[in-house]
Amino acid sequence: MYKRQTDFCGVRSGKDIDKFKEMHLTPLPSKEISAPGIAESPVNIECKVREIKPLGSHTMFLADVVNVTVDDKFFDKKNTFHLNDTGLVTYSHGAYFLLGKKLGTFGYSVAKKKAKKRK
């Protein structure tokens, strides 16, 4: 989990400091864009900005995902992705959250009782 690095890189500008050097992170060449990914990250998502919307105190960037790289160690022999093992962090309304708790499976809200027991 890279909570401190995520916060630091989100708050500090790269104009005057090298965020990779400051946070002891390794740049990872991207496949579709010029900006590097982060080698230590379990998932890297490459995006191309489609639209920039000024919203007063903030700016919203709309982007298209053009490539996703996931570390192979988070897949089992059946090629199932194990999110719980990644330590992924998300940010919402000023707080960081650890991802991974399973809340349900696709179609659980309409599944018959017998099918629910199998999952």
Question: Positions of the model-derived regions?
Answer:
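Basic, polyanion-binding surface patches
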Residues: 3-119
